[in-house]
Amino acid sequence: MTISDKIKSSINSYISRNHIDRLDIKAALIDMDGVLYDSMKYHTLAWHKMMSEVGIECSREEFYLYEGMTGKATINLLFQRKYGRIAGEEEWRKLYEKKAEYFVEIGKKEVMPGANAMLQNLIDCGIDRVLVTGSAQNSLIKYIDSDFPGAFEPQKRITALDVTKGKPDPEPYLKGLEKAGVCHTNAIVIENAPLGAQAGHAAGCFTIGITTGHFLSLTYIMPEQTLFSTLCKVLPTIYTSF
């Protein structure tokens, strides 16, 4: 089965389950780390450095699996494992600030190959764009306008500061749907992280998983979610499948 056939099959399955006539895309809800920026390798280094310094045993690789969670949720996950409790408000804020500092020190701002082409394709087709990120780090978010000019209106951005529950909870993408003013069957989610793909699916959206994630594989995504090797191939293939 070709990629095109797999996409058509996924779309038909989604249409059937949602009892709609066609997949009429009006908005795209787009993750940031791992989709727009090749930044997860730096996030994992920063998380591992910070946690190791405070005596919490962990591996760098495990933070790829937490991609999409809020910083608070990630810290609480490791606190539960180490201490059997969640972190206090002051504790997690200080730890997250330290992690953010390390990310700035370690990280480089690298736009993901194909990201601009994907966004331009959306713009050309009149598809609304909403940024939905589990990050609260302004070190990358502040560059969105300069790196992707005109792609995201300021009022159409969801960050960790806008939600009470991060991915894999659907709240971030449900809020993204509100920002776009569309229902779930009129939006696609573009993700690279297992937890983000779960969140998009839970929000009821047709969710596209792209293979930039360190651990992303078919075992992590739902039946209608099709993997793509590059961002550039995503939208043209889908548009010709309706």
Please provide the spans of the model-predicted regions.
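Asp-based, Mg2+/Mn2+-dependent phosphohydrolase catalytic module
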Residues: M1-K26, Q120, A136-F242
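Conserved phosphate-coupling serine/threonine residues in phosphotransfer and NTP-handling enzymes
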Residues: V35, T133-S135
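Alpha-helical substrate-recognition element adjacent to the catalytic core
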Residues: L45, M50-Y83, E105
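Short helix-capping segments at alpha-helix termini
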Residues: E53-I56, Y83-A87, F148-E153, G181-V182
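Anion (oxyanion) recognition and catalysis
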Residues: S52, I123, H201
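Active-site neighborhood of HAD-like aspartate-dependent phosphohydrolases
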Residues: I3-E62
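Metal-dependent phosphoesterase signature
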Residues: S13, F79-Q120, C125
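Conserved SAM-binding loop
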Residues: L36, R129, V189-I190
